[in-house]
Amino acid sequence: IKLGEMLTNPERVGVHSLYVFSSNPAITAPNQNVVRKGLMRNDLFTIVHERFFTDTCKYADIILPATTSVEHDDIYNSYGHYTIGTGYKLIDPVGESRSNWQVIAELAKRMGLEDAFFNLSERELIEQIVHTSSRISKRDQELILNGEPVEMTVPENYKMDFKTPSGKIELYNPQ
């Protein structure tokens, strides 16, 4: 389901709170006008957890400060490539900023979710992700966990199926 439809379709409007993090749906989600209309609903309680004041922050009831990439442990993949790497905390969070994981884990606890998963530290979560991936070799797991970026291989049978006459991405279609 697309976000705009989820927030505005009278038959589907069951969403009364929204937690937005590491995203700016007011300008990046498909059909932005519908998304913004949904974000303006009086009965929608919106929390935005961000490092910057984004367009989506304009629709928030609460804005929470997020940590920067040097203030928390994280695992990263690159856009348009198949590289995986880790970034480890260099400094303590500034002010009252919290990482995405800290906020999500705390919300889970306050909602009564008792799964041990929410007790993991960021580092433990990264290790679990890396160690349980069937596509990452033991050697590459250690490289990633030691902070080295690893270029993943694309499976031989991988094929993107674009619904265009050429079967490829077409930035301009003369039809």
Spans of features found by a protein language model:
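Long, low-complexity segments enriched in small/aliphatic residues
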Residues: 1, 123-175
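Non-catalytic alpha/beta scaffold blocks inside enzyme catalytic domains
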Residues: 1-136
